[in-house]
Amino acid sequence: MSSAINFQIKRTYVQAKRGELVMGEPDIKLARIDNRLIHGQVATQWNGTLGTNLILVANDEVAGNKMRQGLMDMAAPSGVATRYFTLQKTIEVIHKASASQHIFLVAENPEDVLTLVKGGVPIKKVNIGNMHMAEGKRQVATSVAVDDKDVAAFRELQELGVTLEIRRVPTTPVEDISKLFE
């Protein structure tokens, strides 16, 4: 057993002995990359399919922009909570999530997701939804345009064991991710 795992087991045991709350892994149903963050597709189709009760937007700019948060709150389904955290705050608090929180995590780009994963956020699967065309990007799927920086982040996510899929909405087929690396 690795020393890191041994340390974690010992730390958890000590916390339990002290009567401290030991948090489990957060229930992140899916992480999605979407330039638009929360909008109609995310709020209705994805959230409905996933059965989540919390949409967590991990984005440094939006975390401090009450106007954008308000607009996204209008798109969120009733009964579904929204949270807007910086990447660092997401890393710091995600393991404090209640077992009753079923989380749909939304980030703006693959670099942000990579930051979260490297920071210890247990993201197992990333849905690549909307990455709009911009200068220096190339279209690789219906709604996905990437540049070299995006491709490097996707490669590293794969190397870290994160599953990637390209799919706009839950009712459409998954597109071939090899397109990302061409």
Regions found by a protein language model. Give the residues of each.
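Short, Lys/Arg-enriched N-terminal segments with co-localized hydrophobic residues
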Residues: 3-22
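Structural motif
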Residues: 27-31, 53-56, 81-83, 102-105, ...
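Short, ordered loop/turn segments at secondary-structure junctions
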Residues: 59-62, 87-90, 110, 129-133, ...
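A general structural motif
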Residues: 34-39, 86, 146-147
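Long, hydrophobic N-terminal alpha-helical segment
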Residues: 19-20, 24-76, 81
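Ordered, amphipathic secondary-structure segments that act as subunit-interaction surfaces
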Residues: 84-129
